[in-house]
Amino acid sequence: EVILNGQRIDGKKPFEINRMGLSRSFQITNIFPNLSVFENLRCGVLWSMGYKYTFLRFLSNLDDANERAKQLMEMIKLDKKRDTLAVNLTYAEQRALEIGVTIAGGANVVLLDDPTAGMSRSETTRFIHLIKEVTEGRTLLTVEHDMGVVFGLADKIAVVVYGEVIAFDTPDKVRANARVQEAYLGSAVADAQAGGH
């Protein structure tokens, strides 16, 4: 049984779950490469407003969608790239755009899969700050292998080794956890850090 905001979501279609307040990004960037930054965001907004292919509904929602897309563009720091095709953005900018599309519908729970995979250290640092800003007031659940990213983003961390949760706590407590140290650093390092020989 999976509960979101007091309602069961298991068995629901992805678009229904999205409209209930959960959105996600993929490990592989999932945007429209031949649309501009603004158009990608507007598509996300229109979809969240229930627009599919009804022309009259599209017209009635266009002003609101344009305004929301503009706000999102500023939030993800791509307002200077408004008319740039997504395919011409840097990889980090494409990931930022995907985050914008992910939150376009106002989701209060955001799932991210390896959000910084493939980024340079400086891009990763900037992206961590961006994620923190745009997910403020939302629940963020991320799967991430870069422990620097995990410790930079998380209030709580679950460490999973071979399918078993070996720790679930604050970053400081997880960092000090002997089982976590052994799993990620090896027992000799964990013993040395604990004062062993």
Annotate each PLM feature.
Residues 1-197:
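Glycine-rich phosphate-binding loops of nucleotide-dependent enzymes
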